[in-house]
C-alpha cells in the first residue's frame, strides 16, 4: 500500500502543469516598466557617482521619471493581481528564500530612496550639501533596485510552468536588459535637455550594452529552443527573431553608431523599447501556448 502511494505521488509529481496562469499583456508591460524604472535609477545613480560633472544634471532629472515609471508599474501589477490587497498581503511575511516575497520587499524598499531622491531633485539648488545628501540616498537604493530588477526573472524561472521552468538565463537577461533600458532612457533625457556632454558618454555606452545584452538573450534562447520549436513554426520564429534582434538590436545599433543626430538616437531608443516588449510578450505567453 505504501509503495502504491509513493508510486502515485511520483507519477503525479512528474506530470506537466496544464493550467496556464492568468497572466497576459499587463504582465509583459509590468516586466518592461520594472526594467525601465530600476534600470533608469541604477544608471542614473552610477553615472552621477562616477561622472558627476558631466551627468549630474541628467541624473537629477531621471529620478522623478523613474518614480513615475514605478507608479505606473505598480498600477499594472495591482491590476494584474486583481485585488490591491494581495500586494499588501505579500508584505506580511519576509521569506528571503521565496523569490516573490524577496522581490516584493525589494520593490517596496526601493520605492523609499527613489521617492526621496526624486523629491530632492525637484528642490531648488541647495549647493553641495543637497547634492551629497541625494547621492547618499541613491547609494542606499542601489541594492534594492538591483534586487527589484532581478527578481521577476528568478520568479518565473523557478516556476513549474512550461517554458518558464527552462529559462535559467531569464534573470540574467532581464537584469542586463534593465541596465540597457536605463541607459537608453538617460540618453533620451540628455537629448531632450540638449546636454551634449552627457549624450557623448551615454551613446557609446548604450551601444556597448546592446551588444552585451545579446549574450544573455542568446543563452536564454538556447534554454527555450526546445519549447519554442515545439510551439511555433519556423516562419513564426523568424518573425519574432526579426522584430527582437533586427528591430531591437541591429537597427538601433546602426542608428547609434552610424547616424549622429538627436532624431536617430530617439529612434534607436524607441526600437530598443519595442524589441524588449516583444521578447517579454513571448516569454509571458509561453505557458498559454503550451496549454
Q: What name fits each language-model region?
A:
Residues 1-53, 281, 286-290:
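N-terminal signal-anchor module of multipass membrane proteins
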Residues 25, 29-36, 48-55, 94-98, ...:
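Long, contiguous internal "core" modules enriched in hydrophobic/ aromatic residues
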Residues 40-106:
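Membrane helical hairpin/interfacial module
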Residues 76, 102, 180, 278-287:
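Juxtamembrane membrane-interface segments at transmembrane alpha-helix termini
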Residues 78-82, 219-228, 283-291:
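A cytosolic-side transmembrane-helix exit/cap motif
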